[in-house]
Swiss-Prot record:
Belongs to the UPF0329 family. Residues 350-427 are annotated as: Disordered. InterPro entries: DUF3654 (IPR022115), UPF0329 (IPR011667). It comes from Encephalitozoon cuniculi (strain GB-M1) (Microsporidian parasite). Residues 408-427 have a biased composition (Basic residues). Residues 382-396 have a biased composition (Acidic residues). The lineage of its organism: Eukaryota, Fungi, Fungi incertae sedis, Microsporidia, Unikaryonidae. This is UPF0329 protein ECU02_1540. Signal peptide: none annotated.
Length: 616
């Protein structure tokens, strides 16, 4: 949770010029965070913010080299200026022209509790004194002296290297200013307050001195270089591309909701430990491992520590082992196929020899020999026809029975499935229970086998009902439009069943507030091979990043230990209680579900909008 809070302070304060770090009124801080989270903060979260406000933060950050415009990715790490869509070039230039300042704020990031205007002024002074010396980023990106221009990731690295000279200047002045403030600590402070103030200023001074060292500057540049290379590498991997871009898009949606007044969607800033990142790269020298470390830090919100690094190494080695097994099986299959072809070729040669021999016998044996040869030829032709008929019987259509969500049973065949047909699923009872009243849900949960759901208050159940009672999403996942909205994750085994997820970006609106998050659909393979939905919810972004309730949407795993496989339904005859209505609409880019007040259907209680996968 602390990383998420620090990240929000950085995004709201450091990156976009808010005075979050200077606020003396806790109510103002709370208001900013509640707008970001689109809900009232829990007491525990308020307490964490209070603690955070009192802590010095020198966390290191990196830039994710993507440019979004609305729901489109208009520039990838490897995109050159001439490859940008003509209609988006002016917009991309508006983003690129800000790169020097954005990168500088990233490199000079210091969060100081209480009044820190002296640091902000220092950051501005150093930047304004040196910015005019270096080439304009837009000119660099256009590549005036080069036909091909440079890639976006190369431009980001050039700006980082240009800013290194400012880092030394900033570090020296930061250390001097911190020392001056140590000497000027008011004598009116109590011994405890004086000690605390001095400790904080000494840490700032030490940070400034480290910024002056060649090692720290090289580490800063190298960390960003690793991120650029990893982003480009992950983007090229089919199995990772979609989850990566959906996470990037989700973060952009968060910023747009928090700051609707901004018309430029700048590249994302992410908190990543530079030292851990660089040392891991030096130790393993493996792009596969670095990509896995980055995925865990950025997509699955796990941070970089010894445990996550070890997990990444194990994941890569296991993936390599499985790939080697598949390659061995493929080689074995090819060898068996080659041997089979050779045997078939030998049989053909032998058959041709027999036919030639029979032809010679015909000339020698007269009419009788010819008749015998003809009879034998008929017998062989008959055997071949029998073989063909047997093969046709084996490949004949086998009738299957599939169950559509909310529909009747229908017969299908392996060859008879039409291209326009949708997907077919069963719905588990643990999903359907959320359509009941909060009181009935509580009674069922208290008697159930899932310990984490027991003894919840009615208020908690009502809050959970808002994000779980979305069974209408099944109308989208069974439709042929499903793949435009949902991304399918890799399969994994848990509780004796094969499971996987479908994930989409979404926005939940209630009471004039919006929450950005993921719409999660958890599925498992039933005993008859059917796909069963056992988990369905809208997971707000802040709970995902804070590690609350099940972790990342894209992670391989879930918090449901055991599923009673027999408790599923095809949704036939399902109806809400009388008077409750919702309206579903889709325009191809958004699938919208409006939940209305049963007593006044003109009143919309909440709206869930599922967004199409970003256009690339």
């Amino acid at each position: 949770m602390r990383v998420w809070l620090v990240c929000m302070v950085g995004l709201l304060g450091g990156l976009h010029g808010s005075n979050v770090e200077e606020s003396e009124d806790m109510k103002k801080v709370r208001k900013i965070f509640e707008k970001a989270f689109s809900r009232k903060l829990y007491d525990s979260e308020v307490e964490r913010i209070r603690k955070l406000e009192k802590e010095l933060c020198l966390d290191t950050r990196v830039m994710i080299p993507f440019i979004f415009h609305g729901d489109r990715v208009v520039a990838l790490p490897t995109t050159r200026y001439q490859d940008v869509d003509k209609s988006e070039k002016k917009y991309v230039e508006k983003v690129v022209v800000q790169l020097r300042w954005l990168v500088w704020r990233l490199m000079a990031w210091v969060y100081v509790p209480g009044g820190s205007s002296w640091i902000r002024d220092l950051i501005n002074e150093v930047f304004e004194a040196t910015v005019s010396r270096d080439p304009d980023p837009v000119s660099l990106y256009k590549g005036a002296r080069r036909r091909s221009g440079i890639r976006l990731m190369d431009l980001v690295m050039k700006v980082f290297k240009q800013n290194v000279s400012m880092v030394s200047e900033f570090g020296q002045r930061l250390a001097r200013s911190a020392e001056d403030r140590i000497q000027g600590i008011p004598g009116s402070l109590s011994p405890e307050e004086r000690k605390k103030e001095e400790e904080m200023l000494r840490k700032i001074k030490e940070h400034g001195e480290r910024l002056c060292t060649k090692e720290r500057q090289e580490e800063m540049v190298r960390a960003q270089e690793i991120i650029c290379d990893v982003c480009a590498y992950v983007w090229e991997r089919d199995e990772d591309r979609m989850s990566f871009i959906m996470e990037v898009y989700s973060r952009h949606l968060c910023l747009k909701i928090v700051m609707p007044y901004t018309d430029i969607e700048v590249p994302l800033i992410s908190y990543i430990d530079h030292h851990k990142l660089v040392s891991t790269d030096e130790k393993y020298k493996s792009m596969n491992i670095m990509a896995e470390v980055f995925k865990q830090a950025f997509i699955e919100h796990k941070g970089i520590d010894d445990e996550s690094i070890n997990n990444a190494v194990r994941e890569v080695r296991e993936r390599k082992r499985l790939e080697e097994m598949r390659e061995m099986e493929e080689r074995k299959r090819r060898e068996e196929e080659r041997a089979k072809n050779e045997e078939e070729l030998l049989r053909m040669v032998e058959r041709e020899k027999r036919e030639e021999s029979k032809g010679r016998g015909k000339k020698k044996g007269g009419k009788r020999g010819a008749g015998e040869a003809k009879e034998e030829s008929k017998e062989e032709d008959g055997k071949e026809e029998e073989g063909v008929e047997a093969e046709e019987e084996e490949s004949a259509e086998v009738p299957l029975v599939e169950t559509a969500v909310g529909g009747a049973r229908r017969k299908k065949s392996l060859k008879g499935k039409r291209k326009g047909d949708g997907h077919h699923y069963k719905i588990h009872s643990r999903v359907l229970r959320w359509k009941r009243s909060a009181e009935k849900i509580k009674r069922e949960l208290d008697k159930g086998s899932e310990e984490r759901w027991k003894n919840r208050s009615i208020e908690e159940i009502k809050e959970q009902k808002k994000v779980h009672d979305i069974v209408e999403v099944s109308e989208l996942i069974k439709s042929k439009e499903c793949d435009r909205f949902f991304f399918r994750t890799g399969k994994y085994m848990k509780g004796g069943s094969e499971r996987w997820k479908m994930v989409a970006n979404g926005i939940l609106e209630e009471g004039g507030e919006k929450k950005v998050g993921k719409v999660e659909v958890g599925l498992f393979k039933g005993e008859r091979g059917e796909s069963v939905v056992y988990h369905l919810m809208f997971r707000p972004t802040e709970t995902e990043r804070a590690g609350m309730v099940g972790g990342s949407s894209f992670g391989k795993g879930d918090d449901v230990d055991e599923i009673k496989k027999e408790e599923s339904s095809d949704m036939s005859g399902f109806r809400y209680p009388p008077g409750v209505r919702c309206e579903m609409t889709s325009n191809g880019n958004e699938f919208r579900i409006e939940y209305r007040n049963p007593k006044n259907t003109s009143e919309v209680l909440r709206t869930l909008t599922i967004l199409r996968i970003p256009e690339i």
